[in-house]
């Protein structure tokens, strides 16, 4: 039974995506070394508004995300408003849904449009793996708080005497689950073993991703959606992603050792997405507001779905869970799609999700559905490459995927596209897009 949920305003307007832009994505500690995520966010939003020629006063809300948050700027969205010349009266708040953060930002703006509280808004995300909130040990943190409360020098010295040398070591943010302690790569290894995914299959997918991304750049398909960034000392601009290995061979991938399960593993640095810096954003409006402003939308948001599963085993199955729900809400099936873009956190995770989308047993026994979502047609899948090649600034990836998919749909004469991602915490996200 169809459970389509049309995403329209009270007046029947569709949710239009009129513009999208991102910075080039740069590997950790390379081109964007020393540039915080908030500045990357300001760059992309300021440039997007300038290119669109939309008056900043038109934008009534900005929802932005940052996964690795900096204590000095916890509401990155508001800092972007204040730092880009937008009206100080523009509502702005920040969200976080791990790797699906900009999916959430888009959904929040869409919901504001549907309720009628705004007619235009910006959604996006930015992250820096090069500018990190380096912390201190729990013992040192407690001593510092107590020292601040101590009234005498003697008491302060007594508190400091409790510390050992190891307590003074800096503590970087962990790329691991808070509740389990498992690293994302540990989960990818679980999935490779559970679903029988070989090292050769993972390397082949990673190689495909890089080859297709390199081809997309060489054919000029990404130039309109990626800005040029001038970074200190302003000698050389950055215009393209710097992680793509267009000249690599499968033999190159085979040389790398496993990165997580060193003895029996198959997940390597080459078949995983790297730590990355970057930002991406989109402008959303009601369809009637876009017409008033004389804007031709890139496309429309047809549906979205978020899901959650247990975190202890194979938790990166978000696409397999959220895709059938998003399709159902769009009133579509997998065969109706022109393009399918899945976030490649790891090749093992991507291949596991593809396997389960076509599994009747998974659909019946796990999802409680009568039939599998469907086998994914390779000719529709990640046609321009994916996150393994482009990189993955956590909060920016969703907005990159949305913009990239809409542009490619338009090049193909329109149709429906699916963008979907897994996320830490056992979360999943999927959105169905439409272009004319």
Curated annotation (Swiss-Prot):
It catalyses: an acyl-CoA + acetyl-CoA = a 3-oxoacyl-CoA + CoA. Disulfide bonds: none annotated. GO terms for molecular function: acetyl-CoA C-acyltransferase activity. It is found in: Cytoplasm. GO terms for biological process: fatty acid beta-oxidation. Belongs to the thiolase-like superfamily. Thiolase family. This is 3-ketoacyl-CoA thiolase.
């Amino acid at each position: 039974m169809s459970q389509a949920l049309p995403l329209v305003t009270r007046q029947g307007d569709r949710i239009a995506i009129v513009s999208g832009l991102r910075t080039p994505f740069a590997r950790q500690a390379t081109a964007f070394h020393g540039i915080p995520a908030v500045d990357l966010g300001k760059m992309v939003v300021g440039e997007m508004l300038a290119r669109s020629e939309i008056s900043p006063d038109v934008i009534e809300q900005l929802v932005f995300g940052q996964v690795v948050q900096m204590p000095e700027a916890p509401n990155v969205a508001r800092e972007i408003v204040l730092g880009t010349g937008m009206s100080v009266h523009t509502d702005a708040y920040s969200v976080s849904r791990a790797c699906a953060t900009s999916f959430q930002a888009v959904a929040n703006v869409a919901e504001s449009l549907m309720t009628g509280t705004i007619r235009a808004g910006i959604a996006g995300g930015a992250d820096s793996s090069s500018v990190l909130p380096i912390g201190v040990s729990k013992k040192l943190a407690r001593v510092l708080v107590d020292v601040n409360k101590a009234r005498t020098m003697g008491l302060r010295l007594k508190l400091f005497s409790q510390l050992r040398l190891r307590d003074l070591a800096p503590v970087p943010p962990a790329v691991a689950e808070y509740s389990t302690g498992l690293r994302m790569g540990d989960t990818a290894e679980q999935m490779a073993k559970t679903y029988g995914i070989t090292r050769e299959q993972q390397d082949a997918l990673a190689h495909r991703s890089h080859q297709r991304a390199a081809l997309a750049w060489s054919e000029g398909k990404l130039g309109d959606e990626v800005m040029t960034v001038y970074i200190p000392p302003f000698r050389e601009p950055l215009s393209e992603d710097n992680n793509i290995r267009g000249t690599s061979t499968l033999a190159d991938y085979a040389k790398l050792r496993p990165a997580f399960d060193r003895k029996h593993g198959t997940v390597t640095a080459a078949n995983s997405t790297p730590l990355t810096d970057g930002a991406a954003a989109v402008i959303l409006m009601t369809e009637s507001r876009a017409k008033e402003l004389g804007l031709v939308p890139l496309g429309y948001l047809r549906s979205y779905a978020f899901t959650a599963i247990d975190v202890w085993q194979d938790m990166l199955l978000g696409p397999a869970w959220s895709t059938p729900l998003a399709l159902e809400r769009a009133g579509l099936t997998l065969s109706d799609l022109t393009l399918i873009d899945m976030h490649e956190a790891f090749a093992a995770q991507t291949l596991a999700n593809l396997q389960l989308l076509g599994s009747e047993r998974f659909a019946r026994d796990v999802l409680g559905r009568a039939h599998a979502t469907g086998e994914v047609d390779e000719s529709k899948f990640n046609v321009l490459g994916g996150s393994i090649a482009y990189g993955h600034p956590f909060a920016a990836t969703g907005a990159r995927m949305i913009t990239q998919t809409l542009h490619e749909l338009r090049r193909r004469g329109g149709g429906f596209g699916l963008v979907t991602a897994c996320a830490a915490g056992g979360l999943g996200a999927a959105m169905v897009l439409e272009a004319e």
